[in-house]
Regions:
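Active-site and NAD+-binding cores of ADP-ribose-processing enzymes
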Residues: 2-62, 91-226
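Extended catalytic/binding region for NAD+/ADP-ribose chemistry, centered on the ART fold
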Residues: 61-94
Length: 226
């Protein structure tokens, strides 16, 4: 990835781009046909691929564009991680429940990569970063604008690289060591077609790969459904 321009007026952006420039192996490629999964309200079944830029100002979306100009589209590499990421109570709030009604009104979409996807490996970025602030960016936790300000700025820096389709990152709620099964990706708007739609079902209908329903799977993760 040699030749990436670094903006000296933006410290966070500069550090991220410098790290990517020094370590081109941080850009991972996923081949065409890679199966991906997404959970979203069933009312969007007719048009499931929608890149959102209009997150509220205090959004807790970790990798959204802070300028809200470029939309993002989040997916999971397995149905399990897509379900786990979509039905979690508010972070930092104990004993909060997830409504069973939400599960009944949601669909699980199956998609596939339309072409090679070039994704920045966020975990590898953390390992390779030589500046402390970059580590803070990719490991940040928190709620709302302050908690995710650094992660969103790092995402914004990657959005400026046209060859980058998005980010690859491990799930914080469904971790599978050494496997893509516990990973997510967020795709950036404005690139050549990235995904094709395959099929969808109501979240409550299919059995997951381990034989559990979505409700049983979430309960096994400690999510309280009501």
């Amino acid at each position: 990835m040699g030749g990436i321009a670094i903006n000296p007026d933006n410290t966070i952006s500069g550090q991220v781009l410098e790290t990517l420039n020094n370590y081109p192996e941080l850009l991972r490629q996923k081949p065409p046909g890679t199966v991906l999964h997404r959970v979203q309200p069933s009312r969007y079944d007719a048009n499931p691929v929608h890149y959102r830029a209009d997150y509220r100002a205090d959004s807790d979306t970790r990798y959204a564009d802070p300028a809200r100009q470029i939309g993002v589209y989040s997916l999971g590499f397995t149905a399990e991680v897509a379900v786990a990421e979509s039905f979690q109570p508010g972070q930092g709030i104990d004993d909060q429940t997830v409504s069973l009604w939400r599960l009944k009104q949601a669909s699980l979409h199956r998609l596939k990569a339309a072409r090679v996807l070039n994704l920045v490996d966020v975990a590898a970025l953390a390992n390779r970063a030589t500046h402390h602030k970059v580590r803070d960016i990719v490991q940040a936790r928190g709620e709302g604008r302050e908690g995710y300000a650094l992660t969103q700025k790092s995402s914004q820096a990657c959005m400026d690289i046209r060859k980058v389709d998005g980010l690859l990152y491990p799930s914080a709620v469904y971790m599978v060591t050494g496997s893509m099964q516990g990973c997510n990706l967020v795709l950036f708007e404005g690139r050549e077609c990235q995904v094709d739609v395959v099929s969808h079902q109501l979240v409550m209908e299919p059995l997951l790969s381990n034989g559990e329903t979505a409700a049983e799977f979430l309960e096994s993760l400690g999510v309280v459904l009501e």
